[in-house]
Amino acid sequence: MVVGVFDKFSCELNNSKPHVLLVNPSDMGNMGTIIRSILGFGIKDLSIISPCADIFNPKTIRASMGAIFKIRFKIYNSFEEYSAEHGNHNMFPFMLDGHKTLSINDCPKTDLYTLIYGNEASGLPASYQEVGQSIFIPQTKDVDSLNLPISVGIGCFMFTSTNPIK
């Protein structure tokens, strides 16, 4: 058996780098997978709106495969609280009724952005249509939505490919 022991820690986000923002994520395994995925694409700043899954839960830590120790994260009480600190970012909420369809040939070009994703079960509230430019990931009619970690991975791939992190 292998056991890891560490102290819980807190971080401040880098305001001059891209962020991923999760709004009320509830699944600890998904959160760990997302942490690992964003780091894989070079995004090292994760913001989370509470209530949310426990970032220090063993399931989250295991799913992150150690990536949690290489990112910065901060938990906020509301989107307004996040926006007050990072309002200089271009905001891109990912929604099933997003106004812009994400495509390889037409991904928004910007160096400073926040990719916003909603809860696994309910997505983002309609009010996020008014936040920045809402994005839709195209998919077939055979499914009603994509899994949250898959959506985050697609968004991170597209944005970091179009806007390499410096």
Where are the language model's segments positioned?
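Conserved beta-strand segments that form the floor/walls of ligand-binding pockets within enzyme
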Residues: 3-5, 20-21, 47, 115, ...
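Short, charged, surface-exposed secondary-structure boundary motifs
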Residues: 82-85, 102-104, 144-150
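Active-site/ligand-binding-proximal alpha/beta "capping" segment
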Residues: 94-144
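Conserved catalytic motifs of the protein kinase core domain
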Residues: 1, 17, 112
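Structured adenosyl-cofactor binding patch, chiefly the S-adenosyl-L-methionine
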Residues: 4, 39-41, 55-69, 126-166
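Short glycine- and Lys/Arg-enriched binding-loop motifs that mark or flank ligand-binding interfaces
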Residues: 25-28, 62, 114, 119, ...
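RNA substrate-binding interface of SAM-dependent RNA methyltransferases
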Residues: 6, 10-98
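Short, surface-exposed amphipathic charged segments that create phosphate/polyanion-binding patches used
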Residues: 86-91, 107-110, 150, 154
